[in-house]
Amino acid sequence: MAEIKNYTLNFGPQHPAAHGVLRLVLELDGEVIQRADPHIGLLHRATEKLAESKTYIQSLPYMDRLDYVSMMSNEQAYCLAIEKLLGVDVPIRAQYIRVMYAEITRLLNHLLWLGAHGFDCGAMNILIYCFREREALFDMYEAVSGARMHAAYFRPGGVYRDLPDTMPQYRVSKIKNAKAIAALNENRQGSLLDFIDDFVAKFPRLVDEYETLLTDNRIWKQRTVGVGVVSPERALNLGFTGPMLRGSGFAWDLRKQQPYDVYDRMDFDIPVGKTGDCYDRYLVRIEEMRQSNRIIKQCIDWLRVNPGPVITSNHKVAAPDRESMKTNMEELIHHFKLFTEGFHVPEGEAYAAVEHPKGEFGIYIVSDGANKPYRLKIRPPGFPHLAAMDEMSRGHMIADAVAVIGTMDIVFGEIDR
């Protein structure tokens, strides 16, 4: 009898479930995966090298473009690393705003993950539900930074500006009449905090809607239960972090274990899985959204009653406010020097990691005392996860490879850097 050779299949980078530019070379025995070889680097933009020729402030917008669905979480790690080197104290109000926006970012990330993962596995409707909520979250980004995605809102020493007292309003147009506009503007009559508070009050019911669509859905369970199982020991050895590690039953969360900003003041739980399969990781992320909602609510309540500065008063590091810059010569000089020359960071090295929506996102900076980093290293959470693709998909069907890619929550901006 003739020997049957393994069949090789190229999956991606044009495949809609490849999440950007993933190319997988799959060795198949019939429809069963024998080996999966991920080919990366198709979105490499040399971010680490570019940062060496830019001032610390000029490199900040690059962070937004690493994991381009968790923008402010990337900025947070970068700012924390610079603040460690500078020894700058961040005002407490700025820390609360950072934590609130880090959790808004977590919701943005998890909603896109849920919509895309469901869509990849054949649940078409969940994507529309998730994008409905993402729209309100983008409005929160836009209210503080003017940008819906690449915000550059976190700055070394605090945040760029305080929360606004008004929300932008929709206006009557050719496609929307006055009645429709009034309904859209209903929760935009107050401040940004009122708008976020309104969203936080509604969100648990919306998460229940997602669970109604998927959690007990027979087809969803068939696609995810028992697929891509990773034991707790193996998850640790592979370098898993975030929901990938917690889905295997290991309660590790940097917000609890190594608190930064004001996470030590927050009351929230760490969800963990039991079996370490795609279904458990789905449940972990769903519960994470509920916990993020709790944290945002605590931040809103504190920010309402505690006014104060939102960025350090050291004008060598942070720009002075617009009004004083336009009336005071010294402030104008500070502003000009900061955005042309930047600030000089003392010699040394620092590593700062945050509990990014995808796992541990770390920034390692080596400074030689100049106004630019001597070396900047980015520790992406998705890189070790993708490295386990072969192990997680071996023995499964081709269709299960899509579920495994989805459960990793891969974005190539941060993997290829």
Curated annotation (Swiss-Prot):
> What is this protein for, i.e. what is its function?
NDH-1 shuttles electrons from NADH, via FMN and iron-sulfur (Fe-S) centers, to quinones in the respiratory chain. The immediate electron acceptor for the enzyme in this species is believed to be ubiquinone. Couples the redox reaction to proton translocation (for every two electrons transferred, four hydrogen ions are translocated across the cytoplasmic membrane), and thus conserves the redox energy in a proton gradient.
Q: What is its EC number?
A: 7.1.1.-
Name the family.
Belongs to the complex I 49 kDa subunit family.
The record describes its quaternary structure and partners as: NDH-1 is composed of 14 different subunits. Subunits NuoB, C, D, E, F, and G constitute the peripheral sector of the complex.
Its annotated compartments are:
Cell inner membrane
Q: Does Cell membrane count among this protein's keywords?
A: yes
What HAMAP family does UniProt report for this protein, alphabetically? NDH1_NuoD
Source species: Polaromonas sp. (strain JS666 / ATCC BAA-500)
Pfam families tied to this protein: Complex1_49kDa
What this protein is called in its record is: NADH-quinone oxidoreductase subunit D
What's the domain of life for this entry? Bacteria
Q: Which GO cellular component terms are attached? A: plasma membrane
Q: What class of enzyme is it?
A: translocase
Q: How does it sit in the membrane?
A: Peripheral membrane protein
Q: Is Cell membrane there in the keyword field? A: yes
SUPFAM superfamilies the UniProt entry points to: HydB/Nqo4-like
Alphabetical keyword list: Cell inner membrane, Cell membrane, Membrane, NAD, Quinone, Translocase, Transport, Ubiquinone
Catalyzed reactions per annotation: a quinone + NADH + 5 H(+)(in) = a quinol + NAD(+) + 4 H(+)(out)
Give a GO molecular function annotation for the protein: NADH:ubiquinone reductase (non-electrogenic) activity
